Amino acid sequence: MSQRRILTFLLFAAFLTFAIVCYWMLQREDIHLGDKFAVVKEGVLLRSMVPTISRLQEIDRRYQIKTIVALLNDEEIKHPALEAEQNFARQHGIRFIILRMGIPLPEQVTEFLEIVNNPIRQPVLVHCWHGTVRTGALVAIYRIKEEGWPLQKALDEMVSYGFNLEAPRYKSMLDIIQGYASKTESKVAPATNY
C-alpha cells in the first residue's frame, strides 16, 4: 500500500471514530456540550447558560419547562438573544422572569427560592449569561437550603461548572453562599451521644 492510501485510510478512520464518539455523546442525557445544562432536581430545577433557541426547544421538549428565570445584568438584558428567548417562552406558554442581578441580594434569593419551590412553576430553568457565577451561586444556595447539602459539596459543584473560588471579585458571592450555609447549619439539631 502506498503512503498516500495509508494516510487517507487513517484520516478516514479518525474522522469516523470522531463522528461515532460525537453521536454517542449527543445521545447521552447527562452530557451536554458546552451549555452547562444540568438537571438540578428532576421535575423541579434545571440550570444552563443562555440557551440557543434550538437548545431551548430541545430542553423544553424533554423537560416541559414551565418557568425560565434569567439572572442578567443591564447590558445582557439588551442582547438580541434574550428577545428571541422571551419570544420562544411566550409562544410556548412558558413564564419568563428576569431577575436583574450582579451579586444576589437576599430579596432576590428569596424570590428565586419562592419561584423554584412553587409546584405550579416547575420545572424551572435558571440561567445567567455564562451559566457559571450567578446560576452557580443560586443553585448552591438552593442545594444548601432546600436539599441540605454541606457548603463544600455545593462549592465543588460550582467549580465543576467553571466557577473560580480564588477570584477576588467573587469573594462577596462566596460570603453570601457561606452565610446561607451557616444559617442552615445552625438549624440542624446538634448530635447527642448517649
Predicted feature descriptions by range:
Residues 2-124, 140-194:
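Cys-dependent protein tyrosine phosphatase-like superfamily
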Residues 128:
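Short cysteine clusters
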Residues 131:
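Substrate/cofactor-recognition hotspot
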Residues 135:
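Ser/Thr-glycine-rich phosphate-binding loops at phosphate-binding pockets of nucleotides
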